[in-house]
């Protein structure tokens, strides 16, 4: 090849490269630009969760974060624009206490999401917990975010079974090791259900020792009080004592006072919690907006009667002297735990007779030819317990107490609900309606809270309590957990006689920037995350 041909080829090569670069530049200019936002909510009334006054603004989401909040944000370039004019745009709601036993099989958690809930805290205090927890967290996919605790009931059952005694030194060391394992695997703290067997057999020394393990990790102590009826004040003092000994923040789940004999005690209970705060303790509580609670029939029996399981109970009942003692104690206990009449106990789940679901103990007495009296009710409860017991709805709370708890400064909201399948079983209506009920009944109808204050209790307050800084408010850079609802239409529809009814007024729910519910339908998306501790190590 001569020199001329080499030079000519080189020039042609340069021209080719120049032309190629030009074509790339032109094609790049013509290609669609990356979306400015993945989702733009326009024209809504923003309540940001901080307690600040509402304002009209657009909310832009990019990825799993809030990208911008402001008036008339640019629509052009947004992948999707949703007009939410006339709707409230708030942070997603936090359910501070619920039961998610079947989450692995029902990750949509539909009855929670349809309430506007984007984060659920599962204490695991009354059921077996997933173990190892880290493997469970890696495997399970769900629509809402979820926070898990080290459940004391499961831990005690694993180590001691149903024994009614204090642990040996070796048993306590084993339980402490199980708490430590759960904390290293992401638990948010220790939870107890001290009203239930076998947790009720644990004394304050045991509970405080286990809480001490969670404290250095930045964990908290959450509890279903040992007693929510006549001994509720002692139960509150015990909870505060655990907090003092373990140097750990304490949270009372579903703060309430049950039993007609104790109605009105909410004032003294709140005064006790306030005095602890004034003394420097970190104390919180959560509430659900119903005057009936739901739990096992075990609650109607003194703990000693149920120790060591069903065979031991049957043996005690067969002994005339022991049975007489039991009957006498239960006659006193009945109005302390439920209402004054047999009709105050409603069956939810009876394993040996599904037809009883929704009926009351009074209905059962009539159907079996017995008088509707306290004496007959106690005998019926014993007979039912011998056949396996039941899960019930106990109408034993006062509306004034519920409102006083709910509106007290610093109180948060919860459902205490179960993960339910629509149309199946007979759940407490709280599983479908707790959060809409607060906004409809206590905000719109009774005006006991402002909308801003209610939203703050449902969003920013629980996030701040747990030290989770990137959730709970609407602000640039926060995780995009968002609930859009109509303040004038939101309402619970579930009732004690017809529980399977969806609430109304929720338009859209997004979790980590992904829409999981919109216009009456679940999208099927499962973007939820397991929460990690936000509080620093102590």
PLM-predicted stretches and their roles:
Residues 83-100, 104-192, 211-218, 277, ...:
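Divalent-metal coordination cores built from histidine and acidic residues
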Residues 2-19:
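Bacterial N-terminal signal peptides that target proteins for export
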Residues 18-29:
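Bacterial N-terminal signal peptides
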Residues 181-239:
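Divalent metal-binding pocket/active-site signature
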Residues 34-40, 46-90, 492:
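Histidine-rich, glycine-flanked metal-binding segment
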Residues 44, 404-410, 415-416, 483-529:
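C-terminal cap of metal-dependent C-N hydrolases
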């Amino acid at each position: 090849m001569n020199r001329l041909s080499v030079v000519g080829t080189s020039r042609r090569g340069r021209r080719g490269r120049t032309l190629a670069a030009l074509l790339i530049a032109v094609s790049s200019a013509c290609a669609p630009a990356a979306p400015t936002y993945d989702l733009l909510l326009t024209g809504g009334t923003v309540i940001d969760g901080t307690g600040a006054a509402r304002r009209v603004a657009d909310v832009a989401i990019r990825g799993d974060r809030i990208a911008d909040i402001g008036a008339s944000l640019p629509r052009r370039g947004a992948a999707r624009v949703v007009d939410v004019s006339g709707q409230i745009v708030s942070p997603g709601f936090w359910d501070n206490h619920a039961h998610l036993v079947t989450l692995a099989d029902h990750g949509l958690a539909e009855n929670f999401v349809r309430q506007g809930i984007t984060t659920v805290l599962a204490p695991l205090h009354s059921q077996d917990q997933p173990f190892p927890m880290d493997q469970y967290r890696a495997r399970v996919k769900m629509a809402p975010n979820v926070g898990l605790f080290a459940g004391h009931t499961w831990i005690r059952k694993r180590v001691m079974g149903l024994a009614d005694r204090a642990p040996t030194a070796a048993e306590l060391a084993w339980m402490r090791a199980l708490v430590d394992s759960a904390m290293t695997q992401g638990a948010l703290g220790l939870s107890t259900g001290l009203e239930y067997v076998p947790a009720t057999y644990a004394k304050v020394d045991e509970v405080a020792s286990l809480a001490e393990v969670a404290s250095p990790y930045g964990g908290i102590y959450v509890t279903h009080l040992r007693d929510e009826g006549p001994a509720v004040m002692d139960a509150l003092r015990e909870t505060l004592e655990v907090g003092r000994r373990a140097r750990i923040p304490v949270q009372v789940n579903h703060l309430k006072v049950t039993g007609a004999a104790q109605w009105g005690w909410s004032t003294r209970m709140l005064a006790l919690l306030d005095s602890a705060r004034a003394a420097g303790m970190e104390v919180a509580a959560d509430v659900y907006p119903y005057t009936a609670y739901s739990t096992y029939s075990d609650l109607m029996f003194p703990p000693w009667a149920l120790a060591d399981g069903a065979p031991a109970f049957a043996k005690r009942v067969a002994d005339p002297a022991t049975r007489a003692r039991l009957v006498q104690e239960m006659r006193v206990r009945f109005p302390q735990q439920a209402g004054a009449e047999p009709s105050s106990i409603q069956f939810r789940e009876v394993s040996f007779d599904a037809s009883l679901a929704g009926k009351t103990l009074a209905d059962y007495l009539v159907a079996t030819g017995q008088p509707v009296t306290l004496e007959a009710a106690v005998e019926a409860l014993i007979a039912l317990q011998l056949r396996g017991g039941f899960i019930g709805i106990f109408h034993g709370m006062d509306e004034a107490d519920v409102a006083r708890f709910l509106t007290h400064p610093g109180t948060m909201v919860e459902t205490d609900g179960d993960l339910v399948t629509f149309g199946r079983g007979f759940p407490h209506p709280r599983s479908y309606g707790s959060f809409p009920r607060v906004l409809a009944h206590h905000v719109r109808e009774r005006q006991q809270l402002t909308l801003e204050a209610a939203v703050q209790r449902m969003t920013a307050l629980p996030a701040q309590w747990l030290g989770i800084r990137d959730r709970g408010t609407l602000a640039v850079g926060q995780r995009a957990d968002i609930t859009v609802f109509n303040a004038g239409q939101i309402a619970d529809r579930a009732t004690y006689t017809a529980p399977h009814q969806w609430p109304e007024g929720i338009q859209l729910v997004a979790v980590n920037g992904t829409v999981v519910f919109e216009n009456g339908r679940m999208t099927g998306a499962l973007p939820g995350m397991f929460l990690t501790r936000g509080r620093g190590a102590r």
